[in-house]
Regions:
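Local sequence-structure signature of Cys/Sec-based thiol-disulfide redox active-site neighborhoods
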Residues: 1-27
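Short alpha-helical
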Residues: 12-13, 43, 73
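Secondary-structure boundary motif
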Residues: 26-30, 91
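Thiol-based oxidoreductase modules, predominantly thioredoxin-like and allied folds used
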Residues: 31-45
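A hydrophobic alpha-helix adjacent to the NAD(P)-binding/active-site core of NAD(P)-dependent oxidoreductases
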Residues: 48
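Structural micro-motif
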Residues: 51-61
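Non-catalytic, surface beta->alpha helical segment in thiol-disulfide oxidoreductase systems
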Residues: 61-93
Length: 93
């Protein structure tokens, strides 16, 4: 299963998300089967424009949005929501 994630290189939420994804992968072996393609929206704006999102990081499975970060979330909330996103992806396998 392959996810597409839109990011910005200096975005603090994107940096945090990468750390959280690595934490989740270390905790859950089954996440090794989920591939993530990270796309810098500033480097590929034409591709980013094809997807419906407002904030980064945002994750998609095909064109279905599975996750869009919020600046209001704590680190724990973001990790919980990323975990729920991975659960949803694994159910589709």
């Amino acid at each position: 299963m392959k996810l597409t994630a839109f990011i910005l290189p200096r975005c603090p939420y994107c940096l945090q998300m990468r750390e959280l994804v690595e934490e989740l992968r270390a905790e859950r072996d089954e996440l090794a089967s989920v591939e993530i393609e990270f796309i810098d929206e500033s480097a590929q704006p034409e591709l980013a424009d094809r997807y419906d999102y407002y904030r980064v990081p945002s994750f998609f499975l095909g064109t279905e949005k599975l996750y869009e970060a919020s600046p209001l979330w704590t680190r724990a909330e973001a990790k919980h929501r990323l975990g729920a996103m991975f659960d949803a992806v694994l159910e589709k396998e």
